Amino acid sequence: MLNSAACIVLAITAVLGRMIYTHFYSNTCAAMKRALAHIPELHFEEDDTPERYRTETRSLVRKGYERYLQYGIPFQMRNPVSELGNQVVLPVKYLEEVKRAPRSLYSFEAFSEKVFLLKYIDAPRQTDALLYAVKLDINKNMDHILNGLWDETQVLLKETVPVTGQITIPGGELACNIIARTMSYVLVGPSLCRNPEWTKIAIEATFALVAGTQGLRDRYSPGWRWLARFQRSSEKLGEVREKAMELIKPLHEERMKALKDDSGQFRNFYDTIFWTMNKRKVDRSLRAIVDQQLFLTLASIHTTAGTLQSILCDWLAHPEYHDEILAEINERLAAFKGAGGKWTQQEVNEMKKLDSFMKESTRVNPVGCMTVQRYAQRTHTFSDGFVLPAGTIFQFPSDAVHHDPKLFPDPEKFDGHRFLRLREKDANAYHYGYVSDTTLNWGAGTHACPGRFLATYVLKFAFIALITQYDLSFPEGTGKPGYFYFDNSVRIDPTAKLDIKKSS
C-alpha cells in the first residue's frame, strides 16, 4: 500500500504530467498544422463531420485524385485519428523516392506504432528475422509447401460442407476459416494448423489488437495515455498470447532441440517458427517466437480472407467468364492428376485467365484504398522541392490509381480479361503478385508485401477447390453484397451469406 506522502507525490506528478503533456500536445498540433500549410487541404463539401472520414474516405480520395494527385500535387485531409494531425496523400511521382528511402526517414513500423498504439497495448511487432523468413525462406521453399496448401484446403472444405445437402454460411466466415487453416500450415506447420484452438487464435488476434487500441483511446485521452503502461491495457490480446504460447511451446522445444543437436532434423521443418528461429541474432525465447507468429496472423489472415470473399462474389456476379476459366482449370487439374496429384508452381502459373480474373477482382474490390503508409521521422525535401515535414503520416492512393481511366480504360467496368491482355504485351508483368507504380495492391518496391506469392497460391487453391468441387450461389433474392468502410479499409460485407453444397 502507498502511504499518504507517496499518494500526494503521485497525484502531483500526474497533474504536472498532464499539464506538461497538454501544453506540449497543443503546441505540437499547432506546429504540425503550420508545417503542412503549403499542402492543399481537402474537405467534404457538406456535413464535414469526423464520422464521414471513417466511412467515406474512398470517395474523398477519388475526388482528391481528380483535383490534385493526377496533376502531381499532394493534398492533406483529416485523419480519423485526430490526435495524429492531418494525413497527407502523395501522387505516384514521389513513389520511387519513398521506395528508396531508408526506414530511418520513412517508417512503416513507426506508422503502426502511432496508429495502433502498439507500445501501450504490448502488441506483437515485426522483426527483421521474421521479414527475412517470409521474404526468403517461404519463397525458396515454395515447392515443399505448395501441395500442403492444396491438401489443407481440401480437408477444411470437407470438414465444413456436408457430403449431402446445402449449408448457408457468411462469406466472411467461410473465407476466414479457409485462409486461417492454409496460412497456418506455413506459419505453425501441419501438426498445429488443424487444431481448432489455434484457428481461433489466428482469427481472433486481429480483433484483440483492434479492440485493445480502441479501448485505450476510449479510456485515455492522449494526455493521460501514459498511465496505461501501468495497467493491463489489452486483456484480450494478453489472453490470446497466453493461449498461443501454450499451443506453440511443444513446437518451439522441438525446433530448439533440432537446432542444438545439428543432426539434420531441421530439414524436416517447413514453417515460419523454425525459419525465424534459424536466423542469426534472433531472440529465440518462446514469447518472442509466439509474438512473431501472432504478427503474421495480423498481417495475413483477414486481408487475404477479404480478398477471397471478393473474388468469390465476383465469380457469382459474372457467369460470362465461367466456361473459359473452368476449361483452363480442368486442363491443369488433368495434368495435376497425371503427375500423381502433385502441383508445381509452373502448373499453377499457367492458369492465366484465372489469374487475370482474380487480379481484376482485387482491383475493383481492394482491402484498402491506400498503400505504402509511412510516418516521416525527419523533414525531407523531394527532388522537385516539395517538403514533407517530420511527424507526417502519409500514403499513396492505390484505389484511385487503379480507377484512373488513363491507366485502366473504363475503370468502373469489371473486365476479367483486362490483365490477360496486358500480359500479352509483357508476359512477365501484370500477374497476380506483380507490383509496379500502377498496380499497388501489394505495396511497392522492396517494401512490397513479402508474402504476396504465398497469398497468391493460397487464394488460387481456395478458389479452384470451391468452384470445381462445390456449387456456390447467393441466397435467393440477394446478389453481390455492398462494402464495409472503416478509415482507409474496404471490404465486402463479411456477414453476407453464401449457399454452398458439394457438386453432384
Curated annotation (Swiss-Prot):
Residues 1-17 form the signal peptide. Pathway: Mycotoxin biosynthesis. The keyword Signal applies. The keyword RNA-binding does not apply. Disruption phenotype: Leads to the loss of pyrichalasin H production, but accumulates novel cytochalasans, all lacking a hydroxyl group at C-7. GO terms for biological process: secondary metabolic process. GO terms for molecular function: heme binding; iron ion binding; monooxygenase activity; oxidoreductase activity, acting on paired donors, with incorporation or reduction of molecular oxygen. Keywords: Heme, Iron, Metal-binding, Monooxygenase, Oxidoreductase, Signal. Its EC number is 1.-.-.-. It holds the Pfam family p450. Belongs to the cytochrome P450 family. Cytochrome P450 monooxygenase; part of the gene cluster that mediates the biosynthesis of the mycotoxin pyrichalasin H, a tyrosine-derived cytochalasan that inhibits the growth of rice seedlings, but also inhibits lymphocyte capping and actin polymerization and alters cell morphology. Pyrichalasin H is indicated as the responsible agent for the genus-specific pathogenicity of M.grisea toward crabgrass. The first step in the pathway is catalyzed by the O-methyltransferase pyiA which methylates free tyrosine to generate the precursor O-methyltyrosine. This is Pyrichalasin C-7 hydroxylase. It comes from Pyricularia grisea (Crabgrass-specific blast fungus). The lineage of its organism: Eukaryota, Fungi, Dikarya, Ascomycota, Pezizomycotina.
